[in-house]
Amino acid sequence: MHTQVLFEHPLNEKMRTWLRIEFLIQQLSINLPIADHAGALHFFRNISDLLDVFERGEVRTELLKELERQQRKLQAWVEVPGVDQDRIEALRQQLKSAGSVLISAPRIGQQLREDRLIALVRQRLSIPGGCCSFDLPTLHIWLHLQQPQRDAQIETWLASLNPLTQALTLVLDLIRNSAPFRKQTSLNGFYQDNGDDADLLRLILTLDSQLYPQISGHKSRFAIRFMPLDSENGLVPERLDFELACC
């Protein structure tokens, strides 16, 4: 059983979008293989949410900019004595490769948007109970296909996201590992500090405290209010130690 809980909070819009995309892509794989109606609806709902996120911004453009920014940051480390040059060069090549694959890929999500089954299910998701067999006979017959046939189709759908997934995973890994966790202490359930142009806050609390953070702010400054899970009887200690990384 976990004794610590990690919370992450974005400090700008691009990071908020990236974390949502990461979450949705992870959700797509949780219930695989799809063998029943519940698993299918979970999968298609996350596909629909993912396409909605894609339509709200220039995901590819922002990721390409970030890949270039991370390459520049790595270049600055080359001159630092004692740095693992091979590791730096390997990361730079990974960033360069991910950028090349992403820029040459079709429009993100285009294959999913054009798929007839996904489009049909997506239209019905906003209707309460709108995915019954009489509403979506296409989905009903799809769920009665042989498992390998469904698996192959899902694999094709997910493969269309690989250029995005590869670039996003690399970028988020570098950002998350860009700053160490440091011990901090809140007073009367409140903590604030400068953001120093950070993109992401990462915070670790012990599970036995049964507290969660409410975080607000941006890249320059942020504030954290610690709240009890039990809003009626829970208590927040006068001094609370936690770990924080500004990435």
From Swiss-Prot:
Assembly notes: Interacts with FtsZ.
Record-given protein name: Cell division protein ZapD
Subcellular localization: Cytoplasm
One GO term describing the cellular component: cell division site
Main localization of the protein described in the UniProt heading: cytoplasm
Keywords assigned by UniProt, alphabetized: Cell cycle, Cell division, Cytoplasm, Septation
Family: Belongs to the ZapD family.
GO biological process: division septum assembly; FtsZ-dependent cytokinesis
Job description of the protein: Cell division factor that enhances FtsZ-ring assembly. Directly interacts with FtsZ and promotes bundling of FtsZ protofilaments, with a reduction in FtsZ GTPase activity.
Organism: Salmonella arizonae (strain ATCC BAA-731 / CDC346-86 / RSK2980)
Origin organism lineage: Bacteria, Pseudomonadati, Pseudomonadota, Gammaproteobacteria, Enterobacterales
InterPro entries referenced in this protein's UniProt entry, alphabetically: ZapD, ZapD_C, ZapD_sf
